[in-house]
């Protein structure tokens, strides 16, 4: 599992990336690649009172979640999450930003593709959703018009409507 957040119902919502393998690069352990024991990406709900675990999302519009990474709830009770995807020998999934409800009834892909959608967070006023794009070292900010809806394009191919915040 990667990111976790407490939902409005007091349960913990987990971004489970399904597992990956570790690489030792000059003594530094780096996560990467889909492991042999990969179990599929998913969003899980953990009831802290009973200990029960329920899988609430495994796909969006027929596309499987590959590596859910980080999650944040908004004041409306829904949540935003990123999916980093998985890397393979000579190819890599594109990442994405999603919006969903904790009841398991609504999930929407909001931005695709994102090279390596990692961290996600809301501005204090919850009018901007921030996405850390790790590989290129960038932080993107998208104006929110309503829960699960941003202003501007859904692709990084066109930059109007989104704010490039930082390049490392």
Indicate residue ranges for each PLM-predicted region.
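Sequence-structural signature of mature extracellular/luminal beta-sheet repeat domains
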Residues: 1-168
